[in-house]
């Protein structure tokens, strides 16, 4: 895994002073690293009944679409308000300074669908906790939440309402 870890670039003081941003665009741009990442994560779910991948706006769309293709499933998008054209359900959640809202199509899943939630990074866990509530409200079962990377010092895993969490890389 060290090969993938070394491809991710650290950007100091972004988006604000004191933050070291994990820039995954370098991994996404490197074909060998990108394919290896997708293969390693997808391998966890081969042979399991997975009906959909849930991609979280915006970088979760990249990982989610690649996993869906590799596993032969569709992808369901969770977006910011006003981006989905059909009837939606929303979840507002707390950020460090304020709130944010996500939404999903109300008919995104069939009852009992088994899904994997995909996102690039697990930080504080607030976003994915909201996504988990949306998925459950739509009648689907979360098999696991899959991340390219996790910032362990932020303890986001502890905020999630489920114990099935996988992170390929941990920082």
From Swiss-Prot:
GO terms for cellular component: cytoplasm. One of its GO terms (biological process) is purine ribonucleoside salvage. InterPro entries: Ade_phspho_trans, PRibTrfase_dom, PRTase-like, UPRTase/APRTase. It holds the Pfam family Pribosyltran. Keywords: Cytoplasm, Glycosyltransferase, Purine salvage, Transferase. It catalyses: AMP + diphosphate = 5-phospho-alpha-D-ribose 1-diphosphate + adenine. It is found in: Cytoplasm. GO terms for molecular function: adenine binding; adenine phosphoribosyltransferase activity; AMP binding. Pathway: Purine metabolism; AMP biosynthesis via salvage pathway; AMP from adenine: step 1/1. Its EC number is 2.4.2.7. Transmembrane segments: none annotated. Catalyzes a salvage reaction resulting in the formation of AMP, that is energically less costly than de novo synthesis. Homodimer. Belongs to the purine/pyrimidine phosphoribosyltransferase family. This is Adenine phosphoribosyltransferase. It comes from Syntrophotalea carbinolica (strain DSM 2380 / NBRC 103641 / GraBd1) (Pelobacter carbinolicus).
């Amino acid at each position: 895994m060290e090969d993938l870890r070394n491809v991710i670039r650290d950007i100091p003081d972004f988006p604000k002073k004191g933050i070291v941003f994990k820039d995954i665009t370098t991994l996404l741009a490197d074909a060998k690293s990108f394919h290896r990442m997708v293969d390693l994560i997808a391998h966890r779910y081969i042979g399991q009944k997975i009906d959909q991948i849930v991609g979280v706006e915006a970088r979760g769309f990249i990982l989610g679409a690649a996993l869906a293709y590799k596993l032969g499933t569709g992808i369901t998008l969770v977006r910011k308000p006003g981006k989905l054209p059909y009837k939606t359900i929303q979840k507002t959640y707390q950020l460090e300074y304020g709130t944010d809202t996500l939404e999903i199509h109300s008919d995104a899943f069939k009852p009992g669908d088994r899904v994997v939630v995909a996102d690039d990074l697990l930080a504080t866990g607030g976003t994915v906790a909201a996504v988990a509530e949306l998925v459950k409200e739509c009648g689907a079962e979360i098999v696991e939440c899959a991340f390219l990377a996790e910032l362990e010092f932020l303890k986001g895993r502890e905020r999630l309402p489920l114990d099935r969490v996988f992170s390929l890389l941990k920082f």
